[in-house]
Amino acid sequence: MNIMYQRKIESKLQAWLEDPSHKPLVVKGVRQCGKTSSVVDFAKKHFKHIVYLDFREHPDYKKLFTPNLDVDSIIMRLTALMPNTEIKPGKTCFIFDEIQDCPQARSALKYFHLDGRYEVMCTGSLLGVNGYKSKEDKREEEEASIPVGFEEIVDMYPMDFEEWLWANGIKPMHIDYLKKCLTEITPVDDALHSRFKELLHQYVIVGGMPEVVGIFIETRQIGKVLATQRRIIDEYKADMIKYALPADKPRIRECFESIPSQLAREYKKFVYSIVRSTGRGRDYAGSLQWIEDAGIIRRCYNTEITELPLDGNSIQTEFKVYMADIGLLVSMLEEGTQSSILEGNLFSHKGAIFENLVADIFGKMGRKLYYFHKNGGIELDFVMRYKGQCIPVECKANTGNSKSIRTVLGHPEKYRVTNAIKLGDYNVGMKDNLLTLPMYMAFLLSEV
């Protein structure tokens, strides 16, 4: 199945190409998020000739970049290996897929940039992940070097909720209408409200992995969706076994497999003793970092106070861990979860699904994630910068205000907060400085 959906990365690729001083591009992101498809599709639209090298599929391509890295030598070796390849200055784009598997190719980006005759676009997953390389690859990497100042890196994520809406036929006029409802604080039309809720419930099950999205849209069969998601999870686990340092391999997998249990708790702070009863941070911190660097999870940090700057006020040792893609989390839960979600129940598992959905939406916007928790009962699911203020965000099923929101809004002199947002199963409204929004409008809460 090779369906191309509209992706936001396209505008970033276009801006890169139109910049007269652009450098070779590296599109970085978790495996299976659509990097290769987006880059190849873009190149086909803009270049007459494409030279595509996949270093994961064809490790023998590495020899094209030894013993030296000048562009003419690389082209000579390449055309000897692939005689029918057409390479013309000004009309050719080189695509280096899975460039992390060939450090010398990444070093060559400097020489392609200085040469200036050809465009280069790369994709990379597991870039910079500790222990990724074998001993042989490490020797290659030591001989190579990252071309600092000679490459541009763009992050790419799985499809976000807005891209999901596009894939399901939602038009710009419909999204503009939602923006208008947010700006004017007016309820969404009942028919559209029902449609967006339905699409949200489906998104929670499917998530944003392009292959999974394609299978759902083509077949509507949840069984096939689940099988594909679990295959992707298995591929992630295989990467953990294949590429991590030997001592880290079991710990990385244990950390990863503990995520549903971590999120099933009332207070969802990541606790190493849930990974293993004798687990300690010093034993598992590097393993968790590996999963985060691979783009599979996102951390959400507790903050000392509800005040900007959030990063400066964050507590680096206290954090929750969410799956970067909500569909993959749901695929890790017990059978029957998908059916419950389609019926509108997003609040099971002690709010884990709902919270991870918000983390998915905010994270794919490029937001760093923060929350606020103090002993004594004050907990805000998320805090974020919005319209220049620190804004608490509550994710709850009920319509009443929680004790935490009432306390924080009732003591602005202590918490330095005057407005809050509540996301849930209701329409747009405002009361006592609390903006209530349907969950499907969370993607409109950009930092600007």
Locate predicted features.
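N-terminal pre-Walker A segment at the start of P-loop NTPase domains
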Residues: 1-18
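Hydrophobic anchor at the beta1->P-loop junction of P-loop NTPases
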Residues: 27
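Conserved lysine of the Walker
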Residues: 35
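Interdomain motor-coupling "hinge/lid" segment immediately C-terminal to the ATP-binding subdomain
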Residues: 124, 130-264
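Accessory nucleic acid-recognition modules appended to NTPase machines
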Residues: 214-380, 387
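Hydrophobic positions on the alpha1 helix immediately C-terminal to the Walker A/P-loop
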Residues: 38, 42
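Active-site beta-strand-loop-beta-strand hairpin of nuclease catalytic cores
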Residues: 384-392
